[in-house]
Amino acid sequence: MSQIPNHQILDAKTDIEELLSDSKKAPVKLVYAAKKNHDLISEEAEDLESFRVELLSDFAKTDEQGNIIREMGEDGEPTEQAEFESQEALQEFQERLSEIYSDEADLDVRTVDIDSVGEYVAPANWGKNLDFMFKGFETKKEELRGGEVQASTDSIENILGMKSGVEEEPELPLKFSSALYRTYKSLAEAQTQIEERRFELLAEYAEKDEDGVVKTKEDSTRAKFPDEESEERFHEELNEVYNQQYEVEASMVEIGYTDGVDIHPRHVIILDFLLMD
């Protein structure tokens, strides 16, 4: 059994159907696993869509027949966006939907050894969305400083096209993209620890308004401090956080999978801990 986040199931359904629609180019074992998983993933996705529609019926505006009222576009035609009675109703709908999407489903999925399909070049997101189908990764525990965690996170986001402003999703060998996404999840846990500590330090040293919100400098997003000593103490302790060691689980991938990939040399240097000969 595999635990799969509900939001991933929705994306996986789309990617599996795209894979099956152009299956002649894909490895046979990958196509076979996708075909075996299609019905199961589709059923789960349909259940999630039904739940979303039910939530809309509870929180969005409806007509006398119970149909959901859509917002009107500038051209006078209804859009895909539902209309809500208030901002509070919209917020509650989004919170409830976020809760169900963050839950996980236990599914008995068909898997395939990553080394048998890893060279197949596909959209980078497939490495994340279809990750539950892949087995056989070698993993390794690594100790990274906080600064290295941030640099590694930034490098992976650049390679996978996760940065804002990227117009076209990159295509990468499946083993490479999946290894990066798996490691990214572990890095995110360490990054959360760093951010939580940073906010604690801001709460301790920065200026705050009556509601306890940290004040920022004029025309800036930088925190405002009551005096130089407080700002110095903040940066000193923050540097300690960045120099602390954090355990990360790296999914290893052979350096050969970067052949033909448009990747800056500095990313290879930063991500050396997950690359092997």
Task: Mark where each language-model region is.
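A composition-driven surface/loop motif
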Residues: M1-D277
